[in-house]
Each structure stands twice: as C-alpha cells, then as structure tokens.
C-alpha cells in the first residue's frame, strides 16, 4: 500500500474522493426530485 501513496498524492486522492461522493449524492437527489413519486418538495406527503 505504501508504494501506491508514493505514486499518488494522498491529500489530492482524499479530496477527489470527497468531491466525487458529493457529486454523486447531488446527482441522486436531483434524479429523485425529477421523478413524480419521489419528489418530496411537491409530492403528496401522505403517499
């Protein structure tokens, strides 16, 4: 494992992993907001 960190900068890798997860979370939320049954902002709150 230490050889991998000699090639990759660990700070940049951690930042890119967090940015990637944030983009994925936003993408999932916007996909759910675009559907009619999973839109919690304009949908029916009781099902």
From Swiss-Prot:
Parts of the chain on the Periplasmic side: 34-47
GO molecular function, one term: metal ion binding
Spans traversing the lipid bilayer: 13-33
InterPro entries linked to this entry: Antenna_a/b, Antenna_alpha, Antenna_alpha_CS, Light-harvesting_complex
Single GO cellular component term: organelle inner membrane
Membrane topology: Single-pass type II membrane protein
Cytoplasmic side: 1-12
Cellular localisation: Cell inner membrane
Binding site for a bacteriochlorophyll: 29
Keyword field: Antenna complex, Bacteriochlorophyll, Cell inner membrane, Cell membrane, Chlorophyll, Chromophore, Light-harvesting polypeptide, Magnesium, Membrane, Metal-binding, Transmembrane, Transmembrane helix
Biological processes per GO annotation: photosynthesis, light reaction
Subunit relationships: The core complex is formed by different alpha and beta chains, binding bacteriochlorophyll molecules, and arranged most probably in tetrameric structures disposed around the reaction center. The non-pigmented gamma chains may constitute additional components.
Entry similarity comment: Belongs to the antenna complex alpha subunit family.
Function: Antenna complexes are light-harvesting systems, which transfer the excitation energy to the reaction centers.
NCBIfam families referenced in this protein's UniProt entry, alphabetically: pufA_517_ASD (NF040861)
Protein name, per record: Light-harvesting protein B800/850/890 alpha-2 chain
Organism: Halorhodospira halophila (strain DSM 244 / SL1)
